From Swiss-Prot:
Species: Hystrix cristata
Name of this chain's protein: Odorant-binding protein 2
Major localisation: secreted
Keywords in alphabetical order: Olfaction, Secreted, Sensory transduction, Transport
Family: Belongs to the calycin superfamily. Lipocalin family.
Cited function: This soluble protein may play a specific role in odor discrimination and perception.
Length: 38
C-alpha cells in the first residue's frame, strides 16, 4: 500500500537501526518493526 506522507500532518522523526547481523534488520527480522497506527 502506498502512503502519501505529505497528507499526514504533525512532527515526524526518522529512526535508523543498525546491527552486527544484517539478518536481524532485514524484512521480517527480529529487530524490524512496522508502525501501523499514528
Amino acid at each position: 500500500e502506498h502512503i502519501d506522507y505529505s497528507q499526514v500532518s504533525g512532527d515526524w522523526h526518522s529512526l535508523s537501526i543498525a546491527a552486527d547481523s544484517m539478518d536481524k534488520i532485514r524484512e521480517n527480522g527480529e529487530l524490524r518493526m512496522h508502525l501501523n497506527h499514528l
